[in-house]
Amino acid sequence: MHDKILILDFGSQVTQLIARRVREAHVYCEIHPNDVSDEFIREFAPKGIILSGSHASTYEDHDLRAPQAVWELGVPVLGICYGMFTMVVQQGGEVEASAHREFGYAEVRAHGHTRLLQGIEDFSTPEGHGMLKVWMSHGDKVTKLPPGFKLMASTPSCPIAGMADESRGYYAVQFHPEVTHTVQGRALLERFVLEIAKAQPDWVMKDHVAEAVAAIRAQVGDEEVILGLSGGVDSSVAAALIHRAIGDRLTCVFVDHGLLRLNEGDMVMEMFAGKLHAKVVRVDAAELFMNELAGVADPEAKRKIIGRLFVDVFKAEAAKLKASGAGHRGATFLAQGTIYPDVIESGGAKTKKATTIKSHHNVGGLPEQLGLKLLEPLRDLFKDEVRELGVALGLPHDMVYRHPFPGPGLGVRILGEVKKDYADLLRRADAIFIEELRNTVDPASGKTWYELTSQAFAVFLPVKSVGVMGDGRTYDYVVALRAVQTSDFMTADWAELPYALLKRTSGRIINEVRGINRVTYDVSSKPPATIEWE
């Protein structure tokens, strides 16, 4: 049994990042809504509790509080932003609206040499005060500390930016240590989890394989599973894990919807049917998908159509397999490679408190009438954990560390209406971009630019531009190249690729892909932009 950290979610969009940071310290944690019962908290038996931020206001939303058991367990508690405010109020302090709201970068002064912050700083002032570079996002302020608490941190506009009652192990900070913009955030959270809560760092993926296999066997029993195999990292790792657990009772359905990357179908079949000896059924549904997507330009509508068609294809394929009598009794589970970031962006976290940004293919495309139970063995894992799990399962490094690919495929990388001709052009342009990234080494790091970017792809723009090739005028389509660097896919910076790489890629695309005469590069970060264009 692993030591556990309980994260109570009050509705912050970045609550999952807290979990990621705790997992990076190799400590198991779970996120649950702030209004879970006292009994649940006692049975969970956490080594420590973290209270998340929220978009709500403490003094206006009187129902958004931590359960009383949080304060009765006798374990360390860390409040973050709103979590600090509710700790203040519930422990007898006071909070009010601030005339000086703080959103963004701030420099926090540490006070009192508490266990949480001692020795953790970014720089010192001439007076010798330890300073932290942090990320703030709050409109309230603490005006009175609760009994037993002392000041731990401050800024000029926020006199109480951190507090501590070390006798009870209660700590709270106004800033967000979970985001990468807080430079020492990881060190702070590790200090709380490992040294203050004293949780054992025994959460590692190579050991998780046996636990995940046991969990799948317990959930599935002697029933059968059908899985949509896309060739992406998530579905591939999910397939390998489930196959390890139940063998031939897993049937992978590889749906070629005409929106895959170049030669992807053949590569998927070679790996899973050829090398892993898994049962894989390849379904050519390109014409069906293209017909249904004709005339549809809205991104959400496209996602819903693709999700619905996947369901229809799965149901039809399951019926065919059952009728064939080929040792298949009929699947009762549908497996998916859903991971934490998928759940976050579709507003489908366990807490149901986050705001929907876009529907996710895995989540939004499954209507209740599917008739299959859902198996999501990766749902609580972050991308880096999924990759580590894939390596532990013996999947090839190149497959496991391949860049993410969206469930709807090129359907959300073709802006507006999806057409076969557009997909053919985009496939070839994208393949050239990826090839150049793989072949270009950064001298400083010794790594390829494919390794240095977290996700890279081409986007098809349904507009034409004038060009000149030879002595003739061209009027052809435009593609945009997108490459980002991120540690968590919650936020991302555009990758500053070498000009020579971009020049070479642009030249190859324009010369080798007839129908494209202009290439642009996307220099938008997330936020405000999302990583995918649709």
Swiss-Prot record:
Disulfide bonds: none
Active site: C81 (nucleophile), H176, E178
Keywords for this protein: ATP-binding, Glutamine amidotransferase, GMP biosynthesis, Ligase, Nucleotide-binding, Purine biosynthesis
GO cellular component: cytosol
Keyword Transferase: no
Limits of the Glutamine amidotransferase type-1 domain: 4-202
Enzyme Commission number, as recorded: 6.3.5.2
Job of this protein: Catalyzes the synthesis of GMP from XMP.
Protein name as annotated: GMP synthase [glutamine-hydrolyzing]
Annotated organism of origin: Methylibium petroleiphilum (strain ATCC BAA-1232 / LMG 22953 / PM1)
Protein encoded by which gene: guaA
